[in-house]
Amino acid sequence: MAFDEIYRKVPSEQVARLKEFRLNHPYKQLIVGDTKWEYLSCGQGEQTLLLLPGALSVGESTFPLITAFENDYRIIAPSYALSLTMAGLCRGLANILETEALNQAHVLGGSYGGLVAQYFVRQYPARVRSLILSHTFVLTPKYAKPLWLAGKVFPAFPQSLVAPILKLRLNKMLLSTLSNANHPETEFWSAYLDEAIASDLLKEVFIHQNKCLLDLAHQRQLTSDDLKGWPGKVLIIESDDDPAIRVRDRELLRSTYPKAQVHTFCDAGHASSILKREEVFLIIRSFLHNVVQDV
């Protein structure tokens, strides 16, 4: 389906912003071993933000954060290379930072990106200045069985069935919250997700994510002791009605980072970065400012 057709219901100024972003933020490429990585590198400033995307796995999906922070921070926003373990993903991220001559970064991960961020700080603690975890959780062995089942069933689905399944999942996680709030960007994000779903690549992305998560579910669970020697600070952003992160999972995340600064939104679902965008950005800016000032 053509771009103009997908975005036909979206206000013209919102479409124009996306087109302008894509024009001004081309991807860079890096080969790590046998794997090709793509990432956005932009912005300015002495501090660096490493933005780790969620379910879509593409750096561009973090563009609201990029445009909000690129005037004050160096920004690295990678697209995850597929067919890698979580260890391979983290190794690739470290290589990107090294290639860009960046010793440290404030790492921000939302949803699936929050999982990547948690493993990255454990594998490369010296690379992480601070950690921002948004709408995410700690993987536990209880997820192994449903992940195994999904890994058996989902790859066999034809694209004609994959598209509505992904749309239903993303609608539950994001679009229904925006629609219920009558948010002015509801049509934009619906179209943006439709554009992603229209690509056959998204099926491969979800298969890859499932394999990574299943592998991790069989490994030792992350604990608060893992980062005892790490001097960085942690910010947790969550919502009291997140349909993707259950209450006990939010509690486990907080107990895994007992010294973290926590901000809990009300009635923001899995979409606080859209519904409460300005407040979220202010919270992040304040946190980053305090991290730098405390040195």
Regions found by a protein language model. Give the residues of each.
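Active-site loop/oxyanion-hole signature of alpha/beta-hydrolase fold enzymes
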Residues: 76-108, 112, 282
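Conserved HGGG/HGGXW glycine-rich cap/lid loop of the alpha/beta-hydrolase fold
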Residues: 31-83
